Amino acid sequence: MSVFKKKDKSDDKKKKHDEETPQGTFQPASQSTSNTNLNSLASSVNNGASVGSTNGSTPNNSNGSTPTYNHNNSAEELEKQKKEEDEKRKKSELEAAAAVVAKKKEDEEKQRKEQVELERKRRDEEIRRTNAAAANAANKELNEQVEISSLEQMGKLDPSSTIHDMFSFFPNEVYNSYEKLQYFSRDLNTAVSHPEIVFVGPRSSGKSSLIEAFIGRALNIVGGGNIVGVGGSNANGCSKRVLYLQFTNNIDFEVPKVTIKKDNTIKEFDHDIIVSIEQLNENLAKRNQLTNDYIEEPIYVSIESRTTLNLTLIDSPGLLFDQSQAESNKIESIVSSLLRPSHRLIIAVESCSQDWKSMSMGQYLKKIDPELSRSTFVFTKFHHTVRGFSSTRDINKYLSGTVPDIKGFFVTLPNHQVRASYSEANRFQEKIYQAHKRDMHALEQLQYDKRYERTIGVAPLRRYILNIVWKSYQDTIPRILKHLRSKRQTAEATLNELQKQSSSLDSTKLRSIASNYTVTFLQITEKLLSGTSEGNPSANGQTLDEEKSQQGDCGEWVDAYKEAIYIDPEEWNIPYWSSKLYGGQQLERLMAEFKAVCDNSKISEVKMDDIATASGINKLNNIPNYAWAASDLTSLISRDTFVPLIEQLCERAMYIMKRLTDIADKVIDSRRKSRCIGSSPFGGNGLNNINSGGNNGININDRLSNTDMDSLDQYPFFTHHVKNLYYDFVHRAAKGCKEKCMDEFYSSRTIYWELTEHPDSSLPSIRNDHHETKTAVCQLATKLFDSIRQRITKNVLLKLYNFFLVPMQTDLWNEIQAQITCLSNEQLEQLFEVQATREQLKQEEKKQQQILEKYSQIDEQFLKAASLFCRPLSNPTPSA
């Protein structure tokens, strides 16, 4: 009994221990079981020991055999429990593994069933789509047959009918005359703008279908379903890009030549491609398959034909008024950029609706064309709307419900299946005619108001637009003719002028031209020296820095050692140093600059060697003459200092005078231009001033012949001869002035004589004290240098004025005029190159005569072509 009791106590302790162990503590299953068994065993042993000690008073238990037996029994039980728990653990692991395998098989089976179900649904969907496509094709075929049958009931197009497509709208004579007008405008370099027409409207409103109907050819740019097109229902069609159809008149192509221009956005199409009309749709589809979004880069298609006027039709992307805001805004931005140029005609295309309030294009266009002055409205799918009316009152009310004062047309176009089936030009035109006739038949049944007949159908719309195009070119004819006549008059005037020049090449006339030019040249030169703004100082004048930079090495002042002399014009008070001057004022500034340089010149250092050598021995008392030394040194230093400055002064003075020839030429050219525009530089009418002589105070230049002065460009040798005479005189005047200036440098003896008139007792008489000697001589030399500098500066400026500037204003006239007057007839002919000039004038006359004859022929041909082109055409204006 004690053994079982101990076991029960051990179990109680084990249970208590398990309850006290935290649940969050992680222990492996085997370890936990072993610990539990060991605890149970220890508990049993302790309990046994406790019982033994308690019953120790009993004699039967005093030998201690019972505790040994209980210990062995507990070990066996512990081992047994361990085995049982190991078996349970293995069994649970096997069960878990089996459960995982079963779960995996179950998932695989479920996935297989789902795949089977998806495959079945896919097959069902394919079958459904195939059936739907077949049904749709059958419905389309049925609708096409119904549409064709409905159109065929309207009868065939009469070959003699006046219904023409765009390529046969005008007679051949009109296209031929138009080609000639274009040729004349190019030959005359007169730009003629080509009309541009933009088709705009909501998506699926029929813009591109209307373009095809307007042209009268199935260009296959429209499609739906499996046919990719511009304006069809296919969202991947050309409607994502703007399409320019550029029609060009070219007499070389009887059959229209279609060229798709290079596409910079797609590398595959970076070159022009020539295609047939049948291949146009395929090529456009390829381009748009590579376009993922709406882009502003357009597609350009050139269509050249002998029977077309130059115009451009622009097909825009369809507007989306009820779609996402981002996409709609992008399309509106592209379309608005197309409509914004004010020279473009706008064709607003919109599907008909019995409720005018639901029409959206009117409000949209008013944002761009507020007065709707260049907008025309075309309402498509008119047949479906007409079938909804049952009374005359309702149909007339509908037709009169358009916005007042707008140009509107109602059209019905064959659907794309019919257009694809009848793409041949005549058959396509016939279907358009039948659709129009069907509309008119329905309107006749309703007894509509005949006033609206001119607004119904493609033919009135085509006539209306082409007449606008024709009238735009007709309006350019007077401008081209005016330009032609202006060129003809210019050619006649040039020819007359050449004939006058040729007849004037005699000695008397040449002498008159020579005298007139010489007088004009000398007079302008004198005015530029005296002071005048006629030479345009802002353009022809020079600042002090510009004057020096233009002269190069001679521009900067240098001393005797070729070192540049720094000048601060502002500090040295040089007048007008930053102003643009020429002539006399520029020479005055040069003289002021020369004076400033001289005034700031200092005597160079005097060395003792020079003093000792220059002093010498006085012949009277053998005492050194330091006054003589100072005079000699001052004479040498002043010559070395001022001679380079005088030479530079003369060089720059010659440069200023030589500049006057170019300025005089510009003044003469300015006066000639003033006469050409009917004015004179002296005021009033040029001819009146010239013929008025001196009675009104006009100087001699006013008596010059306009013809003589205007023809001076023909005689460059003579004008150069006059300028060379002027340059020679300037050189001689500058040379004489320089020689006069050199007289200012006195000899040492002259300076000494002047100095000894006022002897200075401060000069030392003993040569032993070198420092005192040098100081005294330097002071005297400096005093002498300052006196000489003042005298030279003053006298040089006076001589420059008297011997250089004054002769330019007096002797220049007499000398040059005398040399020109004394020229013999042979010399004049040589200077004027009479023989070469006559040959040149003959060639120019011949050339100008050919030009005049050409313009006369063009004038005659142009008038004939304009007469053929300006045939009377009806220009219907649709009623409101």
From Swiss-Prot:
Record key words, sorted: Cell cycle, Cell division, Coiled coil, Cytoplasm, GTP-binding, Hydrolase, Motor protein, Nucleotide-binding
Main location: cytoplasm
Annotated segments matching region G5 motif: 413-416
Alphabetized PROSITE patterns for the sequence: G_DYNAMIN_2
GO biological process, one term: midbody abscission
Bias (Basic and acidic residues) ranges: 8-20, 77-94, 103-124
This protein's record includes keyword Hydrolase: yes
Top-level taxon of the source organism: Eukaryota
Swiss-Prot/TrEMBL catalytic activity: GTP + H2O = GDP + phosphate + H(+)
MF GO annotations: GTP binding; GTPase activity; microtubule binding
Start-end of Polar residues biased regions: 22-31, 532-543
Region (G4 motif): 380-383
Keyword Ribosomal protein listed: no
Stored Gene3D superfamilies: P-loop containing nucleotide triphosphate hydrolases
UniProt region (G1 motif), positions on chain: 201-208
Region of interest: Disordered: 1-124, 532-551
InterPro entries reported for this sequence: Dynamin, Dynamin_GTPase, Dynamin_N, G_DYNAMIN_dom, P-loop_NTPase
Similarity remark: Belongs to the TRAFAC class dynamin-like GTPase superfamily. Dynamin/Fzo/YdjA family.
Physiological role: Involved in cytokinesis. May hydrolyze GTP.
Name recorded for this polypeptide: Dynamin-like protein A
Taxonomic source organism: Dictyostelium discoideum
Lineage, opening ranks: Eukaryota, Amoebozoa, Evosea, Eumycetozoa, Dictyostelia
